[in-house]
């Protein structure tokens, strides 16, 4: 999938869009978000280690989703990583 198609889907589905760059080999330790996230790597590579599915490395053009409260960590590859992230607060019940 290309970036413009991914971003169009985020907008359609009510996500706020941000772009984030991680330096080479940077690590964002285990944490949770209060929002749902949909993320696509646009440069480099990043490994996401989720409590529910384990670790997976994502390359350019690959994407994943995290539901609010999903414990995970992120690590950039040796060339760093840039990704587009959509953030959306979960629906109130």
What are these regions (language model features)?
Residues 3, 16-33, 68:
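Conserved short histidine dyad/triad with adjacent acidic residue
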Residues 1, 7-11:
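Transition segment at domain starts
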Residues 24, 34, 54, 70-71, ...:
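A generic "binding-loop/recognition-motif" signal
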Residues 52-69:
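Short acidic-glycine-tyrosine-enriched beta hairpin
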Residues 9, 27-33, 49-50, 56, ...:
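Short histidine-centered beta-strand/loop micro-motifs
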Residues 34-46, 51:
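Glycine- and acidic-residue-biased ligand/ion/polar-headgroup-sensing regions
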Residues 68-93:
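Ligand-binding loop in jelly-roll beta-barrel domains
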């Amino acid at each position: 999938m290309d970036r413009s198609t991914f971003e169009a889907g985020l907008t359609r589905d009510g996500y706020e869009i941000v772009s984030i760059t991680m330096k080479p080999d940077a690590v964002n330790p285990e944490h949770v978000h209060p929002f749902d996230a949909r993320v696509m790597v646009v440069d480099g590579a990043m490994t996401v280690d989720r409590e529910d599915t384990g670790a997976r490395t994502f390359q350019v053009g690959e994407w994943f989703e995290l539901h609010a409260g999903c414990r995970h960590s992120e690590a950039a590859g040796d060339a760093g990583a840039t990704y587009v992230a959509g953030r959306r607060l979960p629906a109130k019940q």
